[in-house]
Protein backbone atom coordinates (compact mmCIF):
# COMPACT_ATOMS: atom_id res chain seq x y z
CA UNK A 1 0.00 0.00 0.00
CA UNK A 2 2.83 2.38 0.87
CA UNK A 3 4.50 1.72 -2.49
CA UNK A 4 1.27 2.57 -4.29
CA UNK A 5 0.98 5.86 -2.40
CA UNK A 6 4.57 6.75 -3.29
CA UNK A 7 3.92 5.93 -6.96
CA UNK A 8 0.74 8.01 -6.90
CA UNK A 9 2.58 10.94 -5.32
CA UNK A 10 5.31 10.73 -7.95
CA UNK A 11 2.69 10.60 -10.69
CA UNK A 12 0.66 13.50 -9.28
CA UNK A 13 3.69 15.73 -8.82
CA UNK A 14 4.97 15.34 -12.37
CA UNK A 15 4.96 18.57 -14.32
CA UNK A 16 2.42 17.45 -16.89
CA UNK A 17 -0.19 16.46 -14.30
CA UNK A 18 0.20 19.73 -12.42
CA UNK A 19 0.04 21.69 -15.67
CA UNK A 20 -3.14 19.84 -16.61
CA UNK A 21 -4.71 20.54 -13.21
CA UNK A 22 -3.93 24.25 -13.51
CA UNK A 23 -5.32 24.28 -17.05
CA UNK A 24 -8.57 22.66 -15.91
CA UNK A 25 -9.05 25.22 -13.13
CA UNK A 26 -8.27 28.14 -15.43
CA UNK A 27 -10.51 26.65 -18.11
CA UNK A 28 -13.41 26.38 -15.69
CA UNK A 29 -12.97 30.01 -14.65
CA UNK A 30 -12.69 31.08 -18.29
CA UNK A 31 -15.88 29.15 -19.07
CA UNK A 32 -17.75 31.10 -16.40
CA UNK A 33 -16.49 34.38 -17.82
CA UNK A 34 -17.56 33.42 -21.33
CA UNK A 35 -20.97 32.24 -20.10
CA UNK A 36 -21.47 35.56 -18.34
CA UNK A 37 -20.38 37.45 -21.47
CA UNK A 38 -22.82 35.48 -23.62
CA UNK A 39 -25.73 35.55 -21.16
CA UNK A 40 -25.41 39.17 -20.06
CA UNK A 41 -23.97 41.03 -23.05
CA UNK A 42 -23.98 39.18 -26.37
CA UNK A 43 -27.39 37.48 -26.29
CA UNK A 44 -29.24 40.61 -25.11
CA UNK A 45 -27.62 42.56 -27.97
CA UNK A 46 -28.57 39.82 -30.44
CA UNK A 47 -32.08 39.91 -28.99
CA UNK A 48 -32.29 43.66 -29.55
CA UNK A 49 -31.11 43.24 -33.14
CA UNK A 50 -33.81 40.61 -33.66
CA UNK A 51 -36.59 42.85 -32.40
CA UNK A 52 -36.39 42.44 -28.64
CA UNK A 53 -36.24 38.64 -28.64
CA UNK A 54 -35.12 37.15 -25.29
CA UNK A 55 -33.41 33.83 -25.90
CA UNK A 56 -33.60 32.69 -22.28
CA UNK A 57 -37.37 32.40 -22.49
CA UNK A 58 -37.50 30.49 -25.77
CA UNK A 59 -39.11 27.14 -25.07
CA UNK A 60 -42.01 24.90 -25.92
CA UNK A 61 -43.89 22.16 -24.12
CA UNK A 62 -44.19 18.54 -25.11
CA UNK A 63 -46.62 17.01 -22.69
CA UNK A 64 -45.33 17.92 -19.23
CA UNK A 65 -41.76 18.43 -20.46
CA UNK A 66 -40.41 21.87 -21.32
CA UNK A 67 -37.87 22.06 -24.14
CA UNK A 68 -35.76 25.17 -23.52
CA UNK A 69 -34.10 25.65 -26.87
CA UNK A 70 -33.18 29.26 -26.02
CA UNK A 71 -30.77 28.02 -23.34
CA UNK A 72 -29.41 25.56 -25.90
CA UNK A 73 -28.78 28.39 -28.37
CA UNK A 74 -26.89 30.28 -25.64
CA UNK A 75 -24.80 27.18 -24.96
CA UNK A 76 -23.94 26.97 -28.66
CA UNK A 77 -22.81 30.61 -28.62
CA UNK A 78 -20.73 29.86 -25.48
CA UNK A 79 -19.07 26.96 -27.27
CA UNK A 80 -18.32 28.99 -30.40
CA UNK A 81 -16.70 31.78 -28.37
CA UNK A 82 -14.62 29.37 -26.28
CA UNK A 83 -13.58 27.38 -29.36
CA UNK A 84 -12.58 30.59 -31.15
CA UNK A 85 -10.58 31.81 -28.14
CA UNK A 86 -8.74 28.48 -27.94
CA UNK A 87 -8.13 28.59 -31.70
CA UNK A 88 -6.58 32.06 -31.43
CA UNK A 89 -4.46 30.97 -28.43
CA UNK A 90 -3.16 27.89 -30.25
CA UNK A 91 -2.51 29.93 -33.41
CA UNK A 92 -0.46 32.50 -31.47
CA UNK A 93 1.40 29.76 -29.59
CA UNK A 94 2.29 27.88 -32.78
CA UNK A 95 3.49 31.10 -34.42
CA UNK A 96 5.86 31.66 -31.48
CA UNK A 97 7.09 28.07 -31.75
CA UNK A 98 7.65 28.44 -35.51
CA UNK A 99 9.59 31.69 -34.96
CA UNK A 100 11.75 29.96 -32.38
CA UNK A 101 12.37 27.03 -34.73
CA UNK A 102 13.28 29.44 -37.53
CA UNK A 103 15.83 31.25 -35.37
CA UNK A 104 17.33 27.91 -34.39
CA UNK A 105 17.53 26.88 -38.06
CA UNK A 106 19.03 30.24 -39.07
CA UNK A 107 21.96 30.00 -36.68
CA UNK A 108 24.85 28.68 -38.74
CA UNK A 109 26.11 25.28 -37.79
CA UNK A 110 29.88 25.35 -37.36
CA UNK A 111 31.62 23.32 -40.04
CA UNK A 112 33.09 20.65 -37.78
CA UNK A 113 34.85 18.87 -40.60
CA UNK A 114 36.67 22.07 -41.49
CA UNK A 115 37.70 22.57 -37.87
CA UNK A 116 38.93 19.00 -37.65
CA UNK A 117 40.98 19.42 -40.83
CA UNK A 118 42.50 22.63 -39.48
CA UNK A 119 43.36 20.94 -36.19
CA UNK A 120 44.90 18.02 -38.08
CA UNK A 121 46.97 20.35 -40.21
CA UNK A 122 48.13 22.31 -37.14
CA UNK A 123 49.13 19.10 -35.38
CA UNK A 124 51.07 17.97 -38.45
CA UNK A 125 52.89 21.31 -38.53
CA UNK A 126 53.74 21.07 -34.84
CA UNK A 127 55.18 17.58 -35.30
CA UNK A 128 57.58 18.78 -38.03
Swiss-Prot record:
One of its GO terms (cellular component) is membrane. It is found in: Cell membrane. It comes from the Bacteria. HAMAP family: MscL. Homopentamer. Channel that opens in response to stretch forces in the membrane lipid bilayer. May participate in the regulation of osmotic pressure changes within the cell. This is Large-conductance mechanosensitive channel. The lineage of its organism: Bacteria, Bacillati, Bacillota, Bacilli, Bacillales. The gene is mscL.
Amino acid sequence: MKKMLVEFRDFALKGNVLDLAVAVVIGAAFGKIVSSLVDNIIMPLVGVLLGGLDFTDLSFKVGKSVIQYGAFIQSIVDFIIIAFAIFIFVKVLTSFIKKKEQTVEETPVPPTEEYLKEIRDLLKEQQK
